[in-house]
Regions:
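Solvent-exposed loop/turn segments at secondary-structure junctions
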Residues: 91-94, 113-116, 162-165
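Short, functionally critical alpha-helical segments immediately adjacent to catalytic or ligand/cofactor-binding
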Residues: 79-96, 155-160
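Contiguous mid-protein beta-loop-alpha structural module that forms a pocket-lining wall or clamp
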Residues: 124, 133-193
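Substrate-binding/active-site groove segments that recognize
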Residues: 101-124, 135-142
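Short alpha-helical patches at coil-to-helix transitions and adjacent helical residues
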Residues: 3, 63-67, 103, 131-135, ...
Length: 194
């Protein structure tokens, strides 16, 4: 109980004192993903964020309470720090976000995946909305998908569209003699943007 109270105190009172820009600098310095900034998809996304400073500011503010924890956990688990930014896309760092498809929480787990990942749910508690539990489950899930695909981009795509779809598309491309990387797969538009 003491640990939990200390965590709440640090999360709400001490961490916000540190500059959000400092954390963004640390994330940039620890970035692991290799990608081509020349890709039209990336240029389009960059332009959206560059032209909508209000959106970036709002997302940064929403993430202020949670991003440090997610970043810290990814570093401690030796995972790419970019994984800590997925809630930026999933829920805009809103632990109470609810999708029309029933996904919930900061990581937007659907109920079946949440159950598979051991997140509890009852009449008063939903583990999908628990920052610590859902972050642990999300990173476990992503790690599992990475072990299957050996590719972080495909692991992230699996998080969005499900592993069966990724496996099906990889198999289809292999059978056709095509590349099996993220950019070569035919994926739903939402997943491609993701």
């Amino acid at each position: 109980m003491k640990k939990y109270i200390i965590y709440i105190f640090v999360s709400f009172f001490i961490i916000p004192i540190h500059s959000q820009e400092d954390l963004w600098d640390v994330i940039r310095e620890n970035s692991n993903f290799q990608y081509s900034a020349d890709r039209s998809e990336i240029q389009k996304a960059l332009k959206i964020y560059q032209n909508n400073q209000y959106l970036v500011d709002r997302l940064s503010k929403n993430g202020q309470r949670y991003l440090y924890h997610m970043f810290d956990v990814t570093l401690k688990r030796y995972k790419p720090v970019e994984l800590a930014l997925l809630p930026f896309v999933e829920s805009q760092f809103d632990p109470y976000a609810q999708s029309p498809a029933g996904a919930s929480g900061i990581w937007q787990f659907i109920l079946s995946t949440a159950r598979e990942q051991g997140l509890k749910r009852n009449w008063w508690y939903d583990g999908r909305r628990d920052i610590i539990a859902s972050t642990t489950s999300a990173l476990n899930y992503l790690d599992s998908m990475h072990r299957k695909t050996n590719d972080w981009m495909l692991a992230i795509a699996s998080f969005n569209v499900g592993p069966a779809r990724i496996q099906r598309e990889v198999k289809k491309n292999k059978n056709q003699g095509k590349q099996t990387d993220f950019w070569s797969l035919k994926l739903p538009k939402e997943t491609s943007k993701y």
